[in-house]
Design a protein with these regions (language model features):
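Short aromatic/hydrophobic "clamp" motif used to bind/position activated sugar donors
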Residues: 89
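A conserved acidic beta->alpha catalytic loop
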Residues: 42-50, 96
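Acceptor/aglycone-binding surface of glycosyltransferases and processive sugar-polymer synthases
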Residues: 68-83, 100-176, 203-212, 218-219
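Conserved donor nucleotide-binding strand/loop of the catalytic core
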Residues: 36-39, 50-83
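Donor nucleotide-sugar binding loop of glycosyltransferases
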Residues: 14-17, 45, 73, 99
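Hydrophobic helical membrane-anchoring modules
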Residues: 1-4, 16, 20, 145-148, ...
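Short, well-formed alpha-helical segments that are part of the catalytic scaffolds
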Residues: 14-29
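Catalytic metal- and UDP-sugar-binding loop of GT-A-like glycosyltransferases, i.e.
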Residues: 92-94
Length: 231
């Protein structure tokens, strides 16, 4: 693939922040001195997000935008992965809760690794205590069942060599479990995975129903565990 960097942000009803945050990302990427693009993937948005995203794509030649009617960041992730022009693929959250320095750090780490995990556990995080406890419990069980040593499986602040995960695009969970799947598949294939510290600050309440998300992710985790027993 062409050397360079694709940054992907899944978006859902982000009319209040989409334009300004996309411009911030583009300004940051321009300072890195590498070929780059930004892909914005609206999934299920019912506000003006699709119109704003389409206008950003018209304004900037290095922005791609798409909208799918069904909500599901994993569904958007898979589509963005197929659209990516460059050999390195980094994911961010729409609210930019992670320090964007992760992008440059991931870009460097992907020279020697197939995946890069931005880890709040290794860095710093300003989040409600109940969210930290819930996340840590899920991470602990993930590592126990899948025999993995990592400390963060959130959607944002992750990086991949595009070629390492593109073969799995058709199997990506449509919703919020795809990070675990991608990391598991890279590790299973013998790929190299780096974990680096990130700074994270919650800028708003979660956009997901946390109780529903808990049941969903635990169900998906046990499903992946059962499949891993057959691998």
């Amino acid at each position: 693939m062409t050397p360079g960097l694709t940054v992907f942000i899944p978006v859902y009803n982000e009319e209040a922040i989409l334009e300004q945050n996309a411009e911030k990302v583009l300004e940051y990427l321009a300072r890195l001195g590498v070929a780059h693009e930004l892909i914005l993937g609206s999934n299920g948005s019912t506000d003006r997000t699709p119109e704003i995203g389409a206008e950003l794509a018209r304004k900037h030649g290095n922005v791609q935008f798409f909208h799918v009617p069904e909500r599901g960041p994993g569904r958007a992730f898979a589509r963005a992965l197929r659209m990516a022009r460059y050999d390195k693929f980094v994911t961010l959250d729409a609210d930019l809760s992670f320090d964007m320095a992760f992008v440059a750090d991931a870009l460097a780490a992907l020279e020697q690794n197939d995946a890069v995990i931005g880890s709040k556990g290794l860095g710093t995080q300003k989040r409600p205590l109940f969210r930290i406890i819930a996340s840590d419990s899920f991470i602990w069980l993930t590592n126990l069942l899948l025999h993995m040593p990592y400390r963060d499986y959130a959607i944002g602040a992750k990086g991949y060599r595009t070629a390492a995960i593109l073969p799995h695009a058709d199997k990506v969970d449509a919703h919020t479990f795809y990070t675990q799947e991608m990391i598991y598949q890279v590790r299973r294939a013998g790929g190299r995975i780096a974990e680096i510290p990130v700074k994270c600050e919650d800028r708003r309440a979660s956009r997901f129903n946390l109780l529903h998300e808990g049941f969903y992710r635990y169900g998906k985790l046990f499903g992946l565990w059962f499949r891993s027993l057959r691998d």
